[in-house]
């Protein structure tokens, strides 16, 4: 009854920002089963089309494909508009917190890793392969802070705690 009264009294309207210049914010990066980089963003204003060139902090990049995810499944679409959450294939130079399009800025994470650890590798594991895998994970979580010490031939990473370390061990 209360909700019905609220619905009657309050008029909800969604502002239409689709006629403005495109602007979006990157909030997550993952990799699909084919190893392609999947950049998740929220469209804050304007429209974004597949095959369109957009402004990114390092210059311009082409949107090869647009996806709308529902769990693990996705639908390929030709266009997304203000308010949509989507995934983009084709952006290689962005990180979580970056904006793309008309307004460029980076909003860094407020979190700071509490531990720095040296990654110990068994002789059967090629160090460069492990470094490559860690760099891919670093794209998804920039706070990982992967560092390669050439002189000591050691890999160092920054982590939030022991649970993250256990998760990394299982992922790798």
Regions found by a protein language model. Give the residues of each.
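Structural and coupling elements of P-loop NTPases
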Residues: 1-172
């Amino acid at each position: 009854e209360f909700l019905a009264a609220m619905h009657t009294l309050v008029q909800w309207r969604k502002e239409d920002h689709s006629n403005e210049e495109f602007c979006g914010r990157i909030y997550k990066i993952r990799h699909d089963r084919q190893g392609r980089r999947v950049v998740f963003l929220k469209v804050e204003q304007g429209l974004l089309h597949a095959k369109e060139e957009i402004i990114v902090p390092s210059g311009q990049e082409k949107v090869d494909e647009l996806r709308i995810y529902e769990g693990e499944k996705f639908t390929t679409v030709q266009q997304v508009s203000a308010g949509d959450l989507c995934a983009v294939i084709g952006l290689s130079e962005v990180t979580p917190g970056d904006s793309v399009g008309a307004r460029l800025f980076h909003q860094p994470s407020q979190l700071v890793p509490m531990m720095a650890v040296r990654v110990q590798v068994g002789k059967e594991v090629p160090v460069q392969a492990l470094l490559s895998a860690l760099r891919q994970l670093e794209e998804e979580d920039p706070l990982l802070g992967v560092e390669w010490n050439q002189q000591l031939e050691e890999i160092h990473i920054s982590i939030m705690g022991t649970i993250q370390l256990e998760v990394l061990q299982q992922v790798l």
